[in-house]
Amino acid sequence: MKHGKVHRKLNRTAEHRKAMFANMCAALIKHEQIVTTLPKAKELRPIVEKLVTLGKKGGLDKRRQAIAEMRDIEQVKKLFDVLAPRYKDRNGGYTRIIKAGFRYGDNAAMAVIEFVDRDEDAKGRDSGPTQDNSEAEAA
């Protein structure tokens, strides 16, 4: 019976789900907006909301809980230093999910999950390969 089963399995093992959501949390905090499938976005939302609440509470113990959940110290720093002060007057509802059509290939429902009042410049920052200036000048 499926009584009391509130979370989706997403066709993954428990370890894979935990790692995937840790990576997605770090990506969302870094870029403040990510595109994913709708079921993943719906499962990610409460995890991120709880992380922002941890950031708002502050303290070393909450920081360690966030590191254990996300496994990315740089993004935990951003969570506590940038996002927590931004949402200090907001009681929940830090993220929104916007439906984004269907993916070509498998027709999966896609969605954009983003922070409310997000920083527009954070999208795509520090993503992908970078070219070193010294190599570009030598060529």
UniProtKB/Swiss-Prot annotation:
SUPFAM superfamilies associated with the record: Prokaryotic ribosomal protein L17 (SSF64263)
Signal peptide limits: none
GO biological process per UniProt: translation
Modification(s) after translation: May be methylated thrice, on undetermined residues.
Keywords from the UniProt entry: Ribonucleoprotein, Ribosomal protein
GO MF assignments: structural constituent of ribosome
Region annotated Disordered, chain positions: 120-139
GO cellular component labels: cytosolic large ribosomal subunit
Family: Belongs to the bacterial ribosomal protein bL17 family.
Matches recorded under HAMAP family: Ribosomal_bL17
Subunit structure: Part of the 50S ribosomal subunit. Contacts protein L32.
Protein name, per record: Large ribosomal subunit protein bL17
Gene that specifies this protein: rplQ
